[in-house]
């Protein structure tokens, strides 16, 4: 499971997810990618489930890059506890994803295999996604 080795503070504010992604909006390493179309928190468990779905479909061939990292802790209070008496204990880790962010990249497999692998991964994520392909001039083409 992905998580930071150490953090300065155990608890963080929730923050706002306004606007589009500033960086990581183009395919950098692979040939095909999965791009977020909405803002969301993605947990380390969801990232791992998507990674497993992709690698299983590709029969462990090709290469997968995970371009998001769950660096934000989220907290939760126990069940049936009254309001107040402080913030809850850290429950898990999330990656903040904004629209336009490339979350996963794949190389070394055919387009049909990559498209199906990324479709399976998209079903594991709580955000609407689209398949993108690297163009010859360095950018990506927005195919659906």
Curated annotation (Swiss-Prot):
Pfam families listed in its UniProt record: Ribosomal_L16
CDD domains assigned: Ribosomal_L16_L10e
Keyword Isomerase: no
PROSITE patterns for this protein: RIBOSOMAL_L16_1 (PS00586), RIBOSOMAL_L16_2 (PS00701)
Classification via InterPro entries: Ribosomal_uL16, Ribosomal_uL16_bact-type, Ribosomal_uL16_CS, Ribosomal_uL16_dom, Ribosomal_uL16_sf
Keywords per UniProt: Ribonucleoprotein, Ribosomal protein, RNA-binding, rRNA-binding, tRNA-binding
BP GO terms, sorted: translation
Signal peptide: none
Keyword check for Disulfide bond: no
Assigned GO CC terms: cytosolic large ribosomal subunit
GO MF, one annotated term: structural constituent of ribosome
Family, similarity comment: Belongs to the universal ribosomal protein uL16 family.
HAMAP family: Ribosomal_uL16
Reported function: Binds 23S rRNA and is also seen to make contacts with the A and possibly P site tRNAs.
The protein's assembly and partners: Part of the 50S ribosomal subunit.
Name of protein: Large ribosomal subunit protein uL16
Organism: Bacillus mycoides (strain KBAB4) (Bacillus weihenstephanensis)
Lineage: Bacteria, Bacillati, Bacillota, Bacilli, Bacillales
